[in-house]
From Swiss-Prot:
This is UvrABC system protein C. CDD domains: GIY-YIG_UvrC_Cho. Pfam families: GIY-YIG (PF01541), HHH_2 (PF12826), UVR (PF02151), UvrC_RNaseH (PF22920), UvrC_RNaseH_dom (PF08459). Gene3D superfamilies: 5' to 3' exonuclease, C-terminal subdomain, GIY-YIG endonuclease, UVR domain, UvrC, RNAse H endonuclease domain. HAMAP family: UvrC. Keywords: Cytoplasm, DNA damage, DNA excision, DNA repair, Excision nuclease, SOS response. The lineage of its organism: Bacteria, Pseudomonadati, Pseudomonadota, Gammaproteobacteria, Moraxellales. It is found in: Cytoplasm. Interacts with UvrB in an incision complex. The gene is uvrC. PROSITE patterns: GIY_YIG, UVR, UVRC. Residues 26-104 form the GIY-YIG domain. InterPro entries: DisA/LigA_HHH (IPR041663), GIY-YIG_endonuc (IPR000305), GIY-YIG_endonuc_sf (IPR035901), GIY-YIG_UvrC_Cho (IPR047296), RuvA_2-like (IPR010994), UVR_dom (IPR001943), UVR_dom_sf (IPR036876), UvrABC_protein_C (IPR050066). Belongs to the UvrC family. It comes from the Bacteria. It comes from Psychrobacter arcticus (strain DSM 17307 / VKM B-2377 / 273-4).
Length: 614
């Protein structure tokens, strides 16, 4: 591996870059596009460095992101590698290290969810979480492409096999069964209501089911049900009968996926400049679910090239699980190199296929169908959003010639001045930018003073952040005046368009009035696409702010009554809530039960009981 940095003495940027490219080798390697200050804008890999880098400067480049990247390039550095596989691995390592802005291929790079069964306790716990937690010993099952799929599996396992889900701390402190036992989702091993042997059977059945081996469970449950009935232990017989009934119901739903196998099935499609990739996850012969991605790629490029870029980003940056097979809708131009790089990165062999038959062909057809449907829906939403932005531009034509691309909207939420939260949501012409959403906890104001809250939020945000093209305030002239005051103090007035959206006559939805600083209020018809856009953004700001407020309020209310008790610190408060499962259960506890909690004792228990029941 050789580092090459070609710096030309030529001053003119265009000529200098052309001179630089001419001197690049026709060898595999990695290239780094550098900005004016030496910052890394983009990292890529190539079979031939000279050909790949030269392609960025072709006159036929149409993708706006690529054109924007090329306009910012001031220098190019390359690293020669021994093979294309080595280049691919190095590319992904550099992307992880530097996070270049133009390498953002996948917006949603959360790690996938796994169902986990612990192995370091006599009564193992069933749980789920993102990624494989290295320090935890046990069995991981997945990945599940959505939180819904993981939670649904967890609930199903609870109903069928009744394993505990509580934390180890909560488990150790129990003196009586919790609510999960009452609703038949746990057999209460914490208080000895199930033997270690019986619980171990439930654990083994859960593991077998998650591995896709439910036929053995079916036979074993029939045997146990019949044996319990012969021994006149009808309670156990009913328990096994219920498990058997639920298992049959699940098997009937999943009969189409009874073939064994672990695979990721990936299909790509493109239409009108938009690209969609569907990843279908198959584990133990069962489809666990699918997830759609809309990577920011140049849709004019061949689908196979974009699929190759997606796959390397997906397996190196998003998931930490490599199945035995990857089935693709298109054959990759660098399929061998990708396969070798994945095998090297994960330490296990993977087979990449495009020509598949029988059930694998059905999986691939399913992925293609999901891709096309998701693309159609997303494209429809995008075109509608684009039309709404266009309508807004027309409505504001007499007020501003500013291009409206980024819109930020603020809302204040509280309950009679309690737990005041300011919420900020962000939209552009591609939709909501959830990663840019922010919530602000409001301090040091008179409770219920919305003007003071809005002033604090706007000041805190725009002291550090640049202004959007349009700043939307949920409120009328009063809130708009506060926004004007803040921007004046920050020396930013005039750098953005300020609009206040207030409910019109009778405060009815659809009769909103737009307020401006230097223009008369504007009433838009109820069918106005511009009004629909602003109402949608305003409603999203309200939803975001009120959700954050309720969460903060409920958390404060659940702990505030305990905070006034002398001698009850944060750890003891947490222990009490964990032990009884919440404030309501704590209120129903006797003084003796309170004293039984570790660290409380009879004296403190008396004080706690007295305060809670005054």
């Amino acid at each position: 591996m050789v580092n090459v940095s070609v710096l030309s003495p030529v001053d003119d940027k265009k000529a200098r870059l052309k001179h630089l490219i001419q001197r690049l080798p026709n060898l595999p390697g990695v290239y780094k596009m550098l900005g004016k200050n030496g910052d890394i804008l983009y990292v890529g890999k190539a079979k031939s460095l000279k050909s790949r880098v030269n392609s960025y400067f072709a006159k036929t480049i149409d993708h706006p992101k690529t054109r924007a990247l090329v306009a910012r390039i001031h220098n190019i550095e390359t690293i020669i590698t021994r093979s294309e596989t080595e280049a691919l691995l190095l590319e992904q390592n550099l992307i992880k290290e530097y996070r270049p802005p133009y390498n953002v291929l996948l917006r949603d790079d959360k790690s996938y969810l796994y169902v986990f069964i612990s192995a370091d306790q006599p009564y193992p716990r069933l749980a789920y979480g993102r990624g494989k937690v290295n320090h935890q010993k046990g069995c991981f099952f997945g990945p599940f492409p959505s939180a819904h799929a993981a939670k649904e599996t967890l609930v199903l396992m609870q109903k069928m096999f009744q394993m505990r889900q509580c934390t180890n701390t909560f488990f150790k402190q129990r003196k009586r069964p919790c609510l999960e036992y009452q609703i038949k989702r746990c057999r209460a091993p914490c208080v000895g209501l199930v033997s270690a042997e019986e619980y171990s059977e439930d654990v083994n059945n859960t593991i077998r089911f998650l591995k896709g081996d439910s036929s053995d469970i079916h036979s074993a449950l029939i045997e146990k049900m019949e044996a319990s009935a012969e021994e006149l232990d009808f309670e156990k017989a009913v328990f096994y009968r219920d498990q058997l009934s639920m298992l049959r119901e699940v098997q009937a739903k999943q009969a189409v996926y009874t073939v064994q196998g672990e695979a990721d099935v990936i299909a790509i499609a493109s239409q009108v400049g938009m690209t969609c990739v569907n990843v279908l996850t198959v584990r133990g012969g069962r489809v666990l679910g699918g997830k759609n991605y809309f990577p920011d790629v140049d849709s004019s490029q061949p689908l196979a090239d974009n699929l190759s870029a997606f796959i390397t980003s997906f397996y190196f940056q998003v998931t930490d699980d490599l199945p035995a097979e990857i089935m693709l809708s298109h054959e990759l131009p660098d399929q061998v190199a990708v396969s070798e790089a994945l095998a090297s990165h994960f330490g296990s062999k993977v087979v990449i296929k495009t020509n598949v038959r029988e059930h694998r062909a059905e999986w691939l057809d399913l992925a293609k169908l999901n891709t096309n449907n998701a693309l159609k829906t997303k494209l429809g939403d995008y075109l509608e959003l684009h039309a709404r932005f266009g309508a807004l531009k027309d409505v504001l034509a007499d007020i501003t010639d500013r291009t409206i691309d980024r819109i930020e909207c603020f809302d204040i939420s509280h309950t009679m001045g309690e737990a005041t939260i300011g919420g900020c949501v962000v939209f552009d012409q591609s939709g909501s930018r959830r990663r840019d959403y922010r919530q602000y906890a409001i301090h040091d104001i008179v409770g219920g003073d919305d003007y003071a809250a809005m002033k604090q939020v706007l000041t805190r945000r725009y002291k550090k952040q640049p202004l959007p093209d349009l700043l939307l305030i949920d409120g009328g002239k009063g809130q708009l005046g506060i926004a004007k005051e803040v921007l004046t103090e920050l020396g930013m007035l005039g750098d953005t368009l300020l609009i206040g959206v207030a409910k019109g006559e009778g405060r009815k939805a659809g009769l909103e009035v737009l307020h401006f600083i230097d223009h008369e209020p504007l009433d838009l018809p109820m069918d106005s696409k511009a009004l629909h856009l602003l109402m949608h953004i305003r409603d999203e700001a309200h939803r975001f702010a009120i959700t954050a407020h309720r969460k903060k309020r409920d958390k404060r209310r659940s702990s505030s009554v305990l905070e006034v008790i002398p001698g009850l610190g944060e750890k003891r408060r947490r222990d009490l809530l964990n032990h009884f499962g919440g404030l309501q259960q704590l209120l129903g506890a006797s003084q003796q039960e309170l004293a039984g909690v570790q660290g409380i004792g009879p004296i403190l228990a008396k004080t706690v009981y007295k305060v809670l029941h005054e």
